[in-house]
Amino acid sequence: MPQVDPELFDRGQFQAELALKSSPIAAFKKAIRQFREVLDNRFNSGRDIRRLIEDRAWCVDQVLQQAWQRFDWGDDADIALIAVGGYGRGELHPYSDVDLLILLDSEDQESFREPIEGFLTLLWDIGLEVGQSVRSVRQCAEEARADLTVITTLMECRTICGPDSLRQRMLEVTGSTRMWPSKEFFLAKRHEQQRRHAKYNDTEYNLEPNVKGSPGGLRDIQTILWMARRQFGSLNLHALVREGFLVESECSMLASSQEFLWRVRYALHMLAGRAEDRLLFDHQRSIARLFGYEDNDVKLAVERFMQKYYRVVMAISELNDLIVQHFEEVILPCEQPVQIQPLNSRFQLRDGYIEVTHPNVFKRTPFALLEIFVLMAQHPEIKGVRADTIRLLRDSRHLIDDEFRHDIRNTSLFIELFKSSQGIHRNLRRMNRYGILGRYLPEFGHIIGQMQHDLFHIYTVDAHTLNLIKHLRKLNRPEMAEKYPLASKIIDRLPKPELIYIAGLYHDIAKGRGGDHSELGAVDAEAFCQSHQLPLWDTQLVSWLVQNHLVMSTTAQRKDLSDPQVIFDFAQLVGDQTHLDYLYVLTVADINATNPTLWNSWRASLLRQLYTETKRALRRGLENPVDREEQIRQTQTAALDQLVRNGIDQDDAEQLWSQLGDDYFLRHTAGDVAWHTEAILQHPDDGTPLVLIKETTQREFESGSQIFIYAADQHDFFAVTVAAMDQLNLSIQDARIITSTSQFTLDTYIVLDADGDSIGNNPERIAEIREGLIDALKNPDDYPTIIQRRVPRQLKHFAFAPQVTISTDALRQVSVLEVIAPDRPGLLARIGGIFLDFDLSVQNAKIATLGERVEDVFYITDARNQPLADPDLCKRLQAALVEQLSQDNGRDTLPTRINF
C-alpha cells in the first residue's frame, strides 16, 4: 500500500476538524471531497494510474479507520473490518463499491449490533458507497463452499481494523485443502468466463464495450490471477512468470494493457460522475480527447482511440487464451495415458490438441506457421492448440517477411485453407487471434481493431470481415436454406467457392485509408491473387467482386426495380450469370455481417427481385432488352387472364386501366394489377378510401407487407398517409404513387412493423391499420399529429447535418430529391409535412435506414405535375427540409446541392 500522503489525507488535520465540529459527518465529507479532487487532478495531469487507484484505496482505508475508532468494540474484541474484492486487492476507482466484510469470531452478533449499525450508518451518511456483509468465520466457510462469487471475493482480502488473526483463520477454513480445490475452481471459473463472454456475443469488438466484463476486459486478467491464486497461492502477474506460465515480455504487455484499461475506467467514472464500466458513445469522444487523440483527414479521434482500445483487449484475449489453456494442461492432467497421434514430421496431437514435435519447428520450417492452420481445417476433430505451441506461434511471427509471403509453399498453403471443406472461418479467426493473419497480410493488419463511428457498422473492420466469411460458411448448412433459400442454393453451385472467400476477405481491406475503399481494395485483391498464382479469370472475378461489392445492395435499395432501364444497366454491369451469382451471395453475407438488424424480410425480397430480373435479362440477351411497351403488354395480358377467371368483365377492367397510365403497369406485377383491379371494381362508390393489405410474398424470410390505397386524390394525401402510418408504428420501406386521369390515387406502400418483420396474418393488426388509415384519409383536415417519441440515446451521439440534393430526371419528367439525415422517430412524416406545405406530389419513394442515418429518395412533381424548375423554390424547399430534419440534431447544417 502507498506511503502516508498528507495532501491526500492528513490525520492531524482531520482530528482537528473533528474537534471543531459538533457532528463528525461534515469533517468526513470534507476529507473525502479533498482526496477525490486531488486524485482527479493527478489523473488529469497524467500521473501513474496504478499509484492513483492504490492511493484511493489507501485514502478510504484512512476514512474507515477513523470511522471505526468512533465506536466502542470492547477490549480485545474478536471483530475485524476486512476489505474484500477489488478493494481488498488495494484497487479502487472513483465510484467503485467499497466492499467490506465485518468478520466475527462468534456467530453471536447481538453484542456488536449497536456499534455495527452505527458504523454502517455513518458510512452511509458520509457518502461512501459500500457493499457490506457481517459474517462469522464459520459462516464465511459455509457461504464460500456454496458460492463461487463468495469464495472469489474472500480470496482477495486484507484487514483494515481489528485483529488480523480473524482473517488468517477465515483464509485457512476457506483454503483449497478445505473447499474449491484448484481443479474444481478452475473449471468453475472457466465456465463463468465463457458465460460472461457469451453475454457480450463472444467478441471484444462491441460498439459500446464493457471495460470490465467484455472479452479482453479487466475481468479476463483478474480471472487469470484468481486461477493462479487458487493453484499457487500467488496473486500477481510476476508470479506467473516465476511459475513458467508467462514470459517477461508477456507479463509486461499484460501489465501495460491493464493500466490502459484502468485509465479508461477511471476516466469513465470521472465523466459519468458514478460507477460506469460501459464505454458508451456518450463518453467515447470525450475520452479520446482526454487521451490526446485528434481528428485527422482520414480518421476521427474517437476511431483512433477505439482502435487502440480494441487492439489492447484483443491482446489481452490472446494471452488469456494462452494462459487458460496452459492452466488446463497443468491443473487438469489427463487421467488416461497420454495419447500421441503423429500428423507429420512437424506436428502431432497430444490428447486431441495440436502441438509441434520440436521447439525449433517454426525456425527450421517457417511454412509450418501456415501449415498448422491448414491441418486444423483438415482435421476438425482437433480441440485446439497446446499452450507451448501458441507461444511458439507468437514468438515466431517475425519470420513472416516479404520473402516468406512470396514463397510458393506458403502461398499454396494459404490458398489451400480457402479450399477446405470446413473450418475456414474458425482457422482464419485463430490466425487473427495469434497475430499470424495480420502479419502474413499487412493490409489486413492495418484494419485490425478499426471501428467506424456509427450504428450501421457494429463491428470493427476485421471482425466484420471474419463475420462475413462465417456467414458464407453458414449458407452451406442445410438448416440455413429456410432463411436464405436463394443464397443457399446458389452457393452450392459456385464453380470455385474459394474465390468468394477471398473476395470476402478483401472487400473492406482498404477501409480507413481515405478514398474509395472499393477501388483501392480491388487493387489489393488483384495483387493478392497474382502473388498467389491464381489464373487470370479468377483474379479478375475476385477484383471485380471487391470493386462492386456495394452495387447490388445500393441498386436494390435505392433504385426503382420496376424500371427496365435499371435492370438493363445492372445486367450490363454483371455481364453474365456467374458474376451475378457470386455478387448476390457476397451481398447477402455482407449485409448480415455488417449488422444483423439490417437484414430484414423486405431487403431480402428486394435482392431476390433484382437477382431474378437480372437473371431474366441475361437469359434474354443484353442485345435484346425488354422495352416498356412489351413489359406493359405482358403485365396486362397476364392480369386480364386472372381477372376473367375470377369473373371480372374484361371491358370494365380495360376501362379502369385506360385511366392509369404506363407507370402503373411498369411498377406492379400482373398479380398485383389483378388484385387491385378486382377490389376497385367491387368497391362501393361512397367516397370511402379502399385499403388493401397483404404480404408481398409467402416466403417467410423474404417479405414485406403491402398496403394498397385507392381514393380520390388530394394535395395532402402523401403527408396524411405517412403521418398516419407513423402513428400506427409502421416503418415504410417503399412507396409507389400513381394518380389516374380521373384524379384518383393508387398508392402502394411496403411496410414493416416496428420489430422489422412484416405484419403477417394478424387479423387484429390488419384491421387496426386499415381502420386507422381510412379514418385519417376521410378526415384529412385533422392532419395526424406526428408522435413525439424520445430519440434513442445512441442516435443522439451520431448527429450530423442533413443533406438534401435535388436533381431532374428528364426521361421520367420528375425531380429526384435525395435526403441523407440522422434517423429520428417520425422522420418520414416530417418530410411529408414539408411536401404538403410546398404543394408537392410524391410519385415514388425509396426508403433506406442504415444504422443512425436514413438515405431516402423521393421522385416528386409540382402542383402542375411537372419537375421543379424554379431554383428559388428548390432552395426554399431545401432550407425547410434541413431546418425540420435538424431539430434535436445539435449540429450545424451543411450546404445543399441542386442539379438541374
UniProtKB/Swiss-Prot annotation:
Residues 343-705 are annotated as: Uridylyl-removing. Residues 461-583 form the HD domain. It catalyses: [protein-PII]-L-tyrosine + UTP = [protein-PII]-uridylyl-L-tyrosine + diphosphate; [protein-PII]-uridylyl-L-tyrosine + H2O = [protein-PII]-L-tyrosine + UMP + H(+). Its cofactor is Mg(2+). InterPro entries: ACT-like_dom_sf, ACT_dom, HD/PDEase_dom, HD_domain, NT_sf, PII_UdlTrfase/GS_AdlTrfase, Polymerase_NTP_transf_dom, UTase/UR. Residues 706-789, 816-891 form the ACT domain. GO terms for biological process: regulation of nitrogen utilization. Residues 1-342 are annotated as: Uridylyltransferase. The keyword Nucleotidyltransferase applies. Keywords: Hydrolase, Magnesium, Multifunctional enzyme, Nucleotidyltransferase, Repeat, Transferase. It comes from the Bacteria. Uridylyltransferase (UTase) activity is inhibited by glutamine, while glutamine activates uridylyl-removing (UR) activity. SUPFAM superfamilies: ACT-like, HD-domain/PDEase-like, Nucleotidyltransferase, Nucleotidyltransferase substrate binding subunit/domain. GO terms for molecular function: [protein-PII] uridylyltransferase activity; phosphoric diester hydrolase activity. CDD domains: ACT_ACR-UUR-like_2 (cd04899), ACT_UUR-like_1 (cd04900), HDc (cd00077), NT_GlnE_GlnD_like (cd05401). The keyword Nucleotidyltransferase applies. Modifies, by uridylylation and deuridylylation, the PII regulatory proteins (GlnB and homologs), in response to the nitrogen status of the cell that GlnD senses through the glutamine level. Under low glutamine levels, catalyzes the conversion of the PII proteins and UTP to PII-UMP and PPi, while under higher glutamine levels, GlnD hydrolyzes PII-UMP to PII and UMP (deuridylylation). Thus, controls uridylylation state and activity of the PII proteins, and plays an important role in the regulation of nitrogen assimilation and metabolism. Has four distinct domains: an N-terminal nucleotidyltransferase (NT) domain responsible for UTase activity, a central HD domain that encodes UR activity, and two C-terminal ACT domains that seem to have a role in glutamine sensing. Belongs to the GlnD family. This is Bifunctional uridylyltransferase/uridylyl-removing enzyme. It comes from Pseudomonas paraeruginosa (strain DSM 24068 / PA7) (Pseudomonas aeruginosa (strain PA7)). The gene is glnD.
